[in-house]
From Swiss-Prot:
Disulfide bonds: none annotated. It catalyses: an N-acyl-aromatic L-alpha-amino acid + H2O = an aromatic L-alpha-amino acid + a carboxylate; an N-acetyl-L-cysteine-S-conjugate + H2O = an S-substituted L-cysteine + acetate. One of its GO terms (cellular component) is apical plasma membrane. This is N-acyl-aromatic-L-amino acid amidohydrolase (carboxylate-forming) B. Homotetramer. The keyword Cell membrane applies. Keywords: Cell membrane, Cytoplasm, Hydrolase, Membrane, Metal-binding, Zinc. Its cofactor is Zn(2+). The lineage of its organism: Eukaryota, Metazoa, Chordata, Craniata, Vertebrata. The keyword Zinc applies. It comes from Danio rerio (Zebrafish).
Amino acid sequence: MASVFLPALGGVAVCGGTHGNELSGVYLVQEMERQRKEKGDGVWPIPVTTVLSNPRAVKECRRYIDTDMNRCFSRDTLSTPITDSSPYEVRRAQELNNQLGPKESTGAIDMICDLHNTTSNMGLTLIHYTTSDWATLHICKYLQTKITKVPVRVMVLDVPYSDAYSLESVSKHGFSIEVGPQPHGVVRADIYVIMKEAVDLTIDWIHKFNSGTVFEGGDVEAFKIIKSVDYPRDPVTRSLNAAVHPQLQDRDFCLLKRGDPLFLSFSGETVKYEEEEPLHPLFINECAYYEKGIAFHLAKRMRLTIPAVQVQKD
């Protein structure tokens, strides 16, 4: 593939607390704000905006107050008129869109890095929306090269930005960082350190790119979600009647084949994988997905070829 010249990136917004009980991002944003107060903006080589996304939920150490804010950034929700009955998170999403966007406009911030934790054994997972955002994919490739403490994986949702519903979709480029396993309402030092390294390396890549470094092309392994799987439920009460099978628990990104165990019913029976196509489970037994009726996602592994990139000179 031919080299691609891209405009310089004006900076990055690092956002934590979009879910108020995912504490690595909350404390990392607070630490970055402390460093800025102590050392000034020169503490980073590029402009960095820090945002505590959902302050009311952070204060109460809850995922959200009224509704999941990370589902409030679609074009339709951002354009919904605000009334007295509007959920807090819809109001806050529109505030953030005004601050960091507007979404799909030339005035939107160049990059958002939104910080999340998961109770699933996902390691460090980078989530974004397209297979053709070369800047974001190069950052993912850079992190995969530099971080060795945990596996670094890329998850692509591949939907139009207008339909994209999470905070990072407000920016021209952007991705969310998921690090786990970590219980909600808890901060683990090892998970915090991994998240901080990912943010530091993102800032480092942007600085090098803006300074003229040529980043060679290559392949990036990614996972694209195909479907979601609910827990087995009682047909009348809809209550769970099985849990994730011990042989599947904590094995996010493994390859599921027909006949592999998925669930263990509370009466002792094993529910097996019956799909013909082998797929990879993600976000296995994520605490926050119980209310969404999701035991795990199933994804297909894909290989994306990306071109060399360098900054476009004036």
